[in-house]
């Protein structure tokens, strides 16, 4: 299944706020109206919606998300927590969380068009897994810096997660540590996502 490129507002109306996909928010009460129209949700549908929330927020294909679930399942610790850490430490998400891109699709575009350096080298893979002490910066070119400056200027002031440091005047961010689960940028029940996939196999 390919990455979603359809109307974004339609998705947030059904699934709730997805800040990685769009900075628009559903109108208050719209999810309650949707629920009353559709009646009581089945357990399968609840798990499916949590999975879709994760997929659309991080802008993943079905195959990519399944791959991350399998990697998380083989790692030490809670599969759900490891899954969120893997997704949060992607380069496109780090750029978004730093405010250097307005959305995750916007961050992906910056990376694909070779505007971003990691530790002084161009990285053009949005799924690149960032590590503690990685430095993320704009290329030393006017266009690259202008794109990031536009995003920094238009981003609403929000508390930066404690695993990141932003140096806006240098168009640069630093990864301090692996993200703590309380700083994940999406309201999600990750256990339902893991359950969804465990029942598919």
From Swiss-Prot:
It is found in: Plastid, Chloroplast. It comes from the Eukaryota. GO terms for molecular function: rRNA binding; structural constituent of ribosome. Pfam families: Ribosomal_S4, S4. The keyword Chloroplast applies. InterPro entries: Ribosomal_uS4, Ribosomal_uS4_bac-type, Ribosomal_uS4_CS, Ribosomal_uS4_N, S4_RNA-bd, S4_RNA-bd_sf. Residues 15-44 are annotated as: Disordered. GO terms for cellular component: chloroplast; small ribosomal subunit. The keyword Lyase does not apply. Keywords: Chloroplast, Plastid, Ribonucleoprotein, Ribosomal protein, RNA-binding, rRNA-binding. CDD domains: S4 (cd00165). Residues 89-149 form the S4 RNA-binding domain. GO terms for biological process: translation. Part of the 30S ribosomal subunit. Contacts protein S5. The interaction surface between S4 and S5 is involved in control of translational fidelity. One of the primary rRNA binding proteins, it binds directly to 16S rRNA where it nucleates assembly of the body of the 30S subunit. PANTHER family: 30S 40S RIBOSOMAL PROTEIN, SMALL RIBOSOMAL SUBUNIT PROTEIN US4M. Belongs to the universal ribosomal protein uS4 family. This is Small ribosomal subunit protein uS4c. It comes from Helianthus annuus (Common sunflower).
């Amino acid at each position: 299944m390919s990455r979603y490129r359809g109307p974004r507002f339609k998705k947030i109306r059904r699934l709730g706020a997805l800040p990685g996909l769009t900075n628009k928010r559903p109108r208050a009460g719209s999810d309650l109206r949707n629920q009353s129209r559709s009646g009581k949700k089945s357990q399968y549908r609840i798990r499916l919606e949590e999975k879709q929330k994760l997929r659309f927020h991080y802008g993943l294909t079905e195959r990519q998300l399944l791959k991350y679930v399998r990697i998380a399942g083989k790692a030490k610790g809670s599969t759900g927590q490891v899954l969120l850490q893997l997704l949060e430490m992607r380069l496109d998400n780090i750029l978004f969380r730093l405010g250097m891109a307005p959305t995750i699709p916007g961050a992906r575009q910056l990376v694909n068009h070779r505007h971003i350096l990691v530790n002084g080298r161009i990285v053009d893979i949005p799924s690149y897994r960032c590590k503690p002490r990685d430095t993320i910066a704009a290329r030393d070119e006017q266009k690259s810096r202008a794109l990031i400056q536009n995003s920094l200027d238009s981003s609403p002031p929000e508390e930066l997660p404690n695993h990141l440091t932003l140096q806006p005047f240098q168009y640069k961010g630093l990864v301090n540590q692996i993200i703590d689960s309380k700083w994940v940028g999406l309201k999600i029940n990750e256990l339902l996502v893991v359950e969804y996939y465990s029942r598919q196999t």
